[in-house]
A protein has these predicted regions:
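Active-site helical microenvironments for divalent-metal-assisted chemistry
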Residues: 1-275, 280-311
């Protein structure tokens, strides 16, 4: 989802800034994009002389967080708060300076992310996961705070190889126990699966590679396949006067691993590597669409479930 932005590829700071500026212009006003550029400059000065474990200037992290938020089409205040989320905690910048420069909304979001970090540090193990989710939503007040924190966590996972192994394991388990469930809870399922996949890759690199290699061995042009299936279904539905919205995706490595583990399958037994969703207007059209789908694709015996009749 987020890799298509060419983030996490270690480009120069100016390239990251330009990418963020360009992407923000796709859906935000010119005045909003100008504020984002001002926030980048503010964060750059605040983090001057700070470096990540990779040796990169620290500013690459908040800019990447901003890129993730822009890819989610978040509002300008959320993007700015993402850019500034570490300036109060890690720099000698008072929250009042953030408020004076970028307004009350941004300062409240930045403050909320700081409080979430403090809450995170109090959580010791999985038994507190449900409590963390409740406290995170209560502490944040504004769900945008949680979204910024999830974007922050995602970029940190994408660059986690520079941490000592014990810290990698801690962060990934914490993500599985706390942050991925929190993302699911607020309806950000794509973000949740991205977090799970990154954590799984770090915790179990051999298992991840085995599944990834098996997927690539199929030599499927994924985009072409998804596009072809969608075109085929759309043509069939249009011919039969069914209005439908069709989306398709390749399932994530961790999702496939869970199925292999739960069902005790081998990879060869996993048929649903790709998932398609068909949304129609009513139940009658749903059954009609299903019949048309079965005319195109033969159902596998014993693998079909009717969640309309039996939710």
């Amino acid at each position: 989802m987020f890799d298509s932005l060419n983030i996490f590829k270690k480009p120069e700071n100016s390239q990251l800034s330009e990418s963020l500026d360009q992407l923000s212009k796709d859906y935000l006003s010119s005045s909003a994009s100008k504020k984002i550029r001002e926030a980048i400059d503010f964060a750059d000065k605040a983090h001057e002389g700070q470096f990540r474990k990779s040796g990169e200037p620290f500013i690459t992290h908040p800019i990447n967080v901003g890129l993730i938020l822009v890819s989610l089409k978040m509002d300008v205040d959320t993007v700015i708060a993402g850019l500034l989320h570490d300036v109060v905690e890690d720099c000698d910048i008072p929250l009042s300076d953030v408020k004076k420069k970028f307004g009350n909304n941004v300062s409240q979001l930045v403050d909320g992310v700081t409080k979430l970090l403090q809450l995170d540090e109090k959580m010791k193990d999985q038994s507190q996961a449900e409590h963390f989710q409740k406290m995170a939503l209560a502490t944040a007040e504004d769900v945008r705070v949680v979204i910024i924190k999830l974007a922050d966590r995602l970029h940190n996972l994408k660059t986690i190889e520079h941490l000592p192994r014990d810290k990698q394991v801690k962060k990934c388990r914490e993500t599985f126990d706390l942050y991925a469930p929190l993302a699911h809870q607020i309806g950000m399922h794509k973000m949740a699966t991205e977090l799970e996949d990154c954590s799984f890759k770090t915790l179990h690199p051999t298992r991840y590679k085995l599944i990834q290699d098996a997927l690539e061995k199929n030599n499927l042009d994924k985009k072409t396949l998804i596009s072809r299936v969608k075109r085929s279904l759309n043509a069939k539905f249009k011919k039969n006067d069914i209005e439908a919205k069709i989306t398709g995706r390749e399932k994530r490595v961790f999702s496939i691993y869970q199925k292999i583990k739960k069902k005790k399958f081998s990879f060869a037994d996993i048929y649903d590597v790709f998932a398609f969703r068909v949304l129609v207007n009513n139940g009658a059209d749903c059954y009609k669409a299903l019949g048309l789908i079965h005319n195109i694709f033969t159902p596998i015996t014993g693998r079909f479930k009717d969640y309309i009749a039996v939710p």
